[in-house]
């Protein structure tokens, strides 16, 4: 039998059974291969992700220790989506969202839908309903660890219910994946870290909620606080490192560092200076920073203050950095050693 006739017959049978468009050639529609993205609020992280930001229609996992900047990063993504007219929702399972802080990061509270569910099942059903509507662009679940199964809430404190949360997540993700892709909604799961007992070799760290999220996530970001930013004796922010542990859209294992200032969020001006020095756009001579033979200031904080007062120069540096994004991506990949890659695979 002729292969082409057999294929045509099979395709027409599939379309009769499941509807037109249930199967097609990948190159038939140009839009199929295009990836829409939303900025993370960090220029260096957008470059490290390889596609200019977090991809829409995918599952994202952000995990790390306490007070490392997980929720801050998710709120920045919401703010960036809202700037482009996107509809966003926040499922606050931890009941800990601070609206005042969210507003300072640029989130439009009037157009942010918030839910504070009582159980894990309720949280995931709300998530599924919003995703299926096709009207939501970004949905954040904070956090996986707080998605407590109903059986655990109704039971006694002494009850042992192993694997209950992992089964809940596995079932929910099986149902959600297809809807997320069809609706082009980005779902960000914030997760916490736990320690595995009795691990002799490799990293003892693991994330909550079982292994399902690790498989279904297209992007996994490991965010850590690596130091403090001080103004004289007062701590005003955190130095933060983010590793792209998994990336289905570009090469993974890139690593970036940026500042998170208390009450402001990610310091974009600090990133412009750091990235500019890396590619030679901003010159550093001793403690002095300069751009196009114009001195920005002595010391990083003074240079940041100069850019804050001269927004047009900051915009010029950002444009130049975006044009050098390919070169920067290679630099970011080279920063990560083999040891770090081995450790990432353990989590």
UniProtKB/Swiss-Prot annotation:
Q: Where in or outside the cell is it found?
A: Cytoplasm
Q: Which InterPro entries match?
A: AAA+_ATPase (IPR003593), DNA_recomb/repair_RecA (IPR013765), DNA_recomb/repair_RecA_CS (IPR020584), P-loop_NTPase (IPR027417), RecA-like_C (IPR049261), RecA-like_N (IPR049428), RecA_ATP-bd (IPR020588), RecA_C_sf (IPR023400)
One Gene Ontology molecular-function label = ATP binding
The record's principal subcellular location, in a coarse class, is cytoplasm
Which SUPFAM superfamilies does the annotation name? P-loop containing nucleoside triphosphate hydrolases, RecA protein, C-terminal domain
Q: Which organism is it from?
A: Bartonella bacilliformis (strain ATCC 35685 / KC583 / Herrer 020/F12,63)
Q: Determine the domain of life of the protein's source.
A: Bacteria
Family under the similarity heading: Belongs to the RecA family.
Q: PROSITE patterns in the record, alphabetically?
A: RECA_1 (PS00321), RECA_2 (PS50162), RECA_3 (PS50163)
Cellular component terms (Gene Ontology): cytosol
PANTHER family, sorted: MITOCHONDRIAL DNA REPAIR PROTEIN RECA HOMOLOG-RELATED (PTHR45900:SF1), RECA (PTHR45900)
Name the CDD domains for this protein. RecA
Keyword Iron annotated:
no
Q: Which GO terms describe its biological process?
A: DNA recombination; DNA repair; SOS response
Q: Which UniProt keywords apply?
A: ATP-binding, Cytoplasm, DNA damage, DNA recombination, DNA repair, DNA-binding, Nucleotide-binding, SOS response
Any keyword Cytoplasm? yes
Binding-site positions, ATP: 64-71
Quote the protein name from its UniProt record: Protein RecA
**Job description of the protein:** Can catalyze the hydrolysis of ATP in the presence of single-stranded DNA, the ATP-dependent uptake of single-stranded DNA by duplex DNA, and the ATP-dependent hybridization of homologous single-stranded DNAs. It interacts with LexA causing its activation and leading to its autocatalytic cleavage.
Q: Which Pfam families match?
A: RecA (PF00154), RecA_C (PF21096)
